[in-house]
A protein has these predicted regions:
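Short, acidic, small-residue-rich periplasmic hinge/interaction motif at the N-terminus
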Residues: 65-69, 73, 79-85, 92-97, ...
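Short, acidic Ser/Thr/Gly-rich low-complexity loop/linker segments typical of extracellular
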Residues: 99-111
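Short acidic/polar hinge/loop motifs at secondary-structure boundaries
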Residues: 115, 239-269
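Surface-exposed extracellular loop regions of Gram-negative outer-membrane beta-barrel proteins
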Residues: 238, 243, 380-381, 427, ...
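A beta-strand signature from Gram-negative outer-membrane beta-barrel systems
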Residues: 255-299, 310
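Outer membrane beta-barrel strand-and-loop segments of large Gram-negative receptors
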Residues: 449, 453-457, 498-511, 586, ...
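Gram-negative outer-membrane beta-barrel transporters
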Residues: 617-619, 640, 644-727
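C-terminal beta-signal and adjacent terminal beta-strands/loops
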Residues: 724-746, 760-766, 771-825
Length: 825
């Protein structure tokens, strides 16, 4: 079949307003990547298929846009609010800093609209008398979607005639104004732009100082802590792990977040010493928000790529009452990726409905859910069996959902009450079967777990003055559980119960947190948090305090301290052993507890360039460990525990995080972040060891460049690169004698030297290349995203080779490439 590529490119050039040469350059780039990535999947004409699909949609559906000349325009809308009370600020000035005359005044409800904004990058400034100006820099404006901004302004603590004008940008600090150190706001736009982000917020934060990334998993290890010690929050509610195939490869992680960047709003990420409103977390908190849909017009997105299909839509439910909806659905089968080990199918759905009223406050209905299915490959040719795992066949089905109804009511312009009633659900149904050389099967593992949480949470926020703001909150979580895990101790032996339980219990928590402006330069954040687990009546009271000093308009110093605690996964409390029969051996376990101390130094080199240095130390105590053993939950990565534990372990993490960042300006941004740390723990044997996640160092380098192309400079070519150098995986020396004496030759380790060995450092490279074509009311984007193009290997342990009689390293180099086409209209 012959195709006239020149003629096709001419049509695209006419439709997009891009010169023929530029179209040819972009096409060759995508054609090369497509042919390399898709040819091995037998898609010979993959490049042509994607090109023709884009061309067909562009020509047949949006042909009416041809003939329109000039740079496409868009509208920037939003609201200006008080950063402490969240109440709208009427009659504030909002303008585009680089466009003369593009300014407006907010109405009586704090709303603003700036029409006729050319596509491209723009900086939005908001100002009001008595407040420090707020700046949102380099906002990406496209032709297909309106931009909606929520701009918080901080009221000055001084009298009007003493106000020092100090503009605050949207990326310099967390959205939560009571955060003192260890906090970072991340935007949805960054998630789609940063190399290696894969539109996944969990992978995005791996670029930040203090976080050690993985390739095969998006588990978040902060300062050497295990990923399961992080808390996931959505709309102010703790939710189950929101990742696809959660907790299978790494407890606390998965392969990809179910929360799409299509529906996420700006969120906060904490790496330590977080404020009093956050509890039941030891290492950090990922506080995510869903954005409201456009309440003025319908907007839609369709994305097709190797990883699957993605459909999103938003718009008004009632223009009269300003109600809106937004949803996103995604389906993928990684059979397209030709992954070794099995086939993964997953899908997810996210939504939010927003209903503002004139007198009764604002109601919202929100939710997220996922369905995952995994089937392992099984080699039926017994001559190809090299390892014990080659004889096993496994299955896995997972379900997760979280949703709720939230209500916010303003009593006046300085006090509000937000209440949420929510429910979460998670289910894991899995099993594994072993085959002998006669192809006779015996069950090796059987798992069926269901967890349902009913949650009531309420927060009262009051701004007493420009110096003093207080938040008080209460949360009641009723937890229903049903779990049944059985594992065969050895091959061909009957299954034995590992954990089993059915019932319900409650976690009750409350907090009080205040922010006090002592002077214009000194701010004190202090509070207290407490929680009670009714399962065993264990409780904890935790003070938090932070002090921030604005030494100069460019220099800040901060110090924060806090106590923290976290309950274990529910299955841990119901572990059963042979000696105890039906008695649960861990039911009286106390919380894992920690104390964080963090210093912070920030220097604003210029309006676009920041330096931040944060040394820290964390002490962990009452850590569940196994008596007379090196085992500790601080190293836990498996989805189950099968031993009796006691709260006699300790841990210590000490290090320093450094970030040097240049925000996007004139199409260029870059960031260098580094972390040097030492993470150690004391087991039940009283000996101190390296933790499993003690890589010692992580260095990230990010850089990206954008070019405006096309006749009217309305199209955007973006190239982004990320390189990560980090210490290698840790492991324990092999106990060869114990391994050879094991009935199944399962590799045994010398636990007296736990995690004393380390593999070579890892160099992980990621890239993102995209080209966006902006037409009137429609936008096309072609993107190629690569993960681990450097081929860094991750190590998963060791396996006994039945053919050679030797023990081999189990490792893998996961390399992913996603080629996609996105249509916004």
């Amino acid at each position: 079949m012959k195709m006239n590529k020149t003629r096709l490119l001419e049509k695209i050039s006419i439709q997009s307003g891009v010169s023929l040469d530029e179209c040819g350059t972009v096409f060759k780039t995508f054609e090369k990547v497509l042919s390399e990535e898709l040819s091995r999947k037998m898609y010979r004409y993959g490049g042509w298929i994607l090109l023709l699909t884009a061309l067909f949609v562009s020509v047949t559906v949006f042909s009416q846009t041809t003939g329109r000349k000039g740079r496409p325009m868009q509208t920037i809308r939003g609201i200006v609010i008080d950063g402490d009370s969240k109440f709208p600020i009427p009659y504030a000035t909002v303008k585009l800093s680089e466009k003369e005359g593009a300014s407006t005044i907010t109405d009586s409800l704090g709303r603003f609209s700036i029409p006729q904004v050319p596509v491209g990058r723009h900086t939005v400034e908001a100002a009001f008398m008595g407040y420090e100006p707020g700046i949102f820099r380099e906002i990406l404006v496209t032709s297909a979607k309106e931009i909606y901004l929520e701009i918080p302004l901080k009221e000055s603590v001084n009298e009007l005639n003493e106000v020092v004008i100090r503009a605050r940008t949207n990326k310099e600090e967390a959205m939560n104004k009571m955060a003192t150190t260890g906090a970072r706001m991340l935007s949805v736009e960054e998630a789609s732009r940063y190399a290696g982000g894969f539109d996944d917020p969990a992978r995005l934060v791996s670029a930040f100082a203090g976080v050690a990334p993985s390739v095969s998993s998006n588990g978040i290890s902060i300062h050497g802590n295990a990923p399961h010690l992080l808390q996931w929050r959505l709309e102010d509610v703790e939710i189950p792990n929101p990742n696809h195939f959660a907790d299978i490869a790494t407890l606390g992680g998965g392969i990809l977040s179910s929360l799409s960047s299509q529906v996420l709003g700006n969120s906060d990420f904490f790496t330590g010493a977080f404020p009093a409103e956050y509890g039941n977390a030891v290492s950090g908190v990922f506080d995510m928000k869903l954005r409201n849909g456009n309440n003025q017009k319908n907007e839609n997105t369709i994305q097709v790529g190797i990883m699957g299909i993605d459909v999103a839509s938003e718009g008004p439910l009632s223009k009269k009452h300003k109600a809106s909806y937004i949803f996103n659905y995604r389906y993928s089968t990684t059979g397209l990726l030709n992954l070794e080990g099995g086939t993964m199918d997953y899908q997810d759905l996210n939504l939010k409905l927003n209903f503002p009223t004139q007198k009764a406050g604002t109601f919202s209905v929100w939710g997220t859910s996922l369905i995952d299915k995994f089937t392992s490959d099984f080699e039926k040719n017994t001559e190809k069996w090299d390892y014990w795992g080659d004889r096993s066949e496994s299955r896995d089905k997972q379900y997760m959902a979280a949703g709720g109804v939230s209500h916010r009511y303003f009593f006046n312009n300085d006090a509000s009450l937000k209440t949420t009633i929510a429910a979460t659900y998670s289910q894991l149904d899995g099993g594994a079967t072993l085959f002998n050389h006669s192809m006779e099967s015996t069950p090796y593992m059987d798992l069926d777990s269901k967890y349902t949480n009913l949650i009531f949470t309420t927060t009262f926020n009051r701004k007493f003055s420009n110096r003093f703001t207080n938040k008080t909150g209460f949360t009641y979580t009723n937890m229903f559980y049903k779990m049944d895990l059985s594992i065969a101790p050895y091959e061909a032996e009957p299954l034995e119960i590992v954990s089993q339980g059915k019932g319900n219990t409650s976690l009750i928590s409350a907090y009080n947190s205040s922010s006090v402006g002592l002077t214009e330069r000194w701010t004190l954040n202090a509070g207290i948090y407490g929680q009670l687990l009714t399962l065993n009546n264990k409780w904890s009271v935790e003070p938090r305090v932070g002090l921030k000093w604005q030494a100069t308009p460019k220099t800040t110093f901060a110090l924060a301290y806090g106590m923290y605690s976290r309950m274990e996964k529910m299955d841990v409390y119901f572990v059963k052993t042979k000696s105890t029969g039906n008695q649960s051996v861990n039911k009286d376990l106390d919380f894992t507890k920690a104390q964080h101390i963090m210093l912070s130094f920030g220097y604003k080199i210029s309006d676009r360039m920041n330096l931040k240095i944060e040394p820290y130390i964390q002490f962990l105590h009452d850590v569940p460990v196994m008596a007379d053993s090196s085992y500790s939950v601080l190293n836990r990565s498996d989805f189950y525990v099968e031993d009796a534990l006691v709260n006699k372990g300790r841990g210590r993490n000490v290090g320093i995080d450094i970030t040097f960042e240049r925000f996007l300006e004139k199409g260029l941004y870059y960031m260098i972040s580094g972390s040097w740390f030492d993470s150690r723990y004391r087991g039940g044997d009283g000996v101190w060891y390296n933790t499993k996640f003690n890589r010692n160092y992580v260095i990230n380098g990010l850089i990206g460049k954008e070019w405006m192309l096309g006749r009217n400079k309305q199209n955007i070519l973006s190239v982004n690169l990320k390189l990560t150098l980090q210490g290698g995986d840790r492991y324990s020396p092999i106990d060869l004698e114990a391994t050879m004496n094991h009935p199944d030759k399962e590799v045994q380790y010398d636990e007296t030297k736990a995690f004393s060995k380390q593999y070579s450092p890892m160099l992980i490279g990621n890239y993102t290349v995209s080209y966006r074509i902006n037409k009137r009311k429609v936008s096309h984007e072609f993107a190629v995203k690569g993960l681990n193009f450097t081929g860094a290997k991750e190590h998963y342990g060791h396996e006994y080779n039945v053919k050679t009689g030797k023990i081999d390293v189990s490792d893998n180099s996961t390399i992913l490439t996603n080629v996609s086409y996105k249509l916004e209209f």
